Amino acid sequence: MKELIEYIAKSLVDNPDRVQVTELQGEKTAIYELRVHPDDLGKVIGKQGRTARAIRTLVSAAATKQNKRAMVEIME
């Protein structure tokens, strides 16, 4: 899952070397913290949060397939 988030984020940003994903694992839930360069934050969030919502939907669908829950938090 972490690799999926990194791949999507690196495809969107101008500074792919500054993309960082941290995984916090629980029993049934995983929280992924996505950090990008401040200049790329708008690209990852998107207009009215649409890109961020799409990333969260993809990750949630992939996690559901593994009978888990996953949340993506975009950090500054």
Provide a role label for each language-model segment:
Residues 1-43, 52-76:
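RNA-contacting regions in translation and RNA-metabolism proteins
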